Amino acid sequence: RDDYCSTSKWRFRKIINMVFGNTHTSRYTMLALVGLAGVVYCAMHLMNGFLMKSIEISDHINFLYLPSFLRLVNVLVLGLVWGTLGTAFGGILLCFWTNDSFPMALWNIAASASSAALAILAMRILQQRTLSLTKLSDLLQLALLYALLNALLHHLLWATLDPSQLVSPNQVAYMVIGDLNGAILGALALRWVATHTRLVALIRQRARTTAD
């Protein structure tokens, strides 16, 4: 059994190196990952709306919003630029299901895609170091900061451009709770993957190499 596990791990590493180790194809690989991130984000959003309909406040607010962690994961794993593009692509796909006007949908996409990147930049400034994906306190603080920023960005956007989205005097708090719940679940999952596999580290390394 030990020999079988060792062989399986060797094959897994070989596949990962074939995918991420070729500099010539690294940019195409990142574009593919951005596309995959967008599709997964879109699918998760639609699934969340279906499964969590009973605790939904509006089309944009839910007491458990699972895709919020994908916004963080995209940026933490793919990097600020590629990760933000992945979330933005997913938001564009969701335009086919939204009831918002197209300009308003684009503003919502901008707020959703940028909130995770802004939270990470703020954490780096506050902590004066790079975030650790295996340090639970880092991920929980990031989840809280992201939830606050995302809710405030959307509330400011809606209050300015689309007051019809203001459905409750407590909706900022509701949105923070929903985003925080989803982000914490995702942070725990990401920490487990980063601790027990090298997949996250390899993707992050390839993202940095491509950016350079």
Where are these regions (language model features)?
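N-terminal amphipathic/basic-hydrophobic helices that include classical n-h-c signal peptides
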Residues: 1-15
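Extracellular/secretory pathway and lumenal proteins
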Residues: 9, 166-167
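Short helix-perturbing small/polar motifs within transmembrane alpha-helices
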Residues: 11-55, 71-163, 187-195, 199-203
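Non-cytosolic membrane-interface motifs at loop->transmembrane helix junctions
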Residues: 57-61, 104-106, 167-176
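Hydrophobic alpha-helical segments embedded in the membrane of multi-pass proteins
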Residues: 62-70
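Hydrophobic transmembrane-helix microenvironments that flank and shape a buried ionizable site
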Residues: 64-65, 76, 176
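Alpha-helical transmembrane segments that form the membrane-embedded catalytic/substrate-binding core
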Residues: 170-186, 190
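Short, charged juxtamembrane terminal tails flanking transmembrane helices
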Residues: 201-212
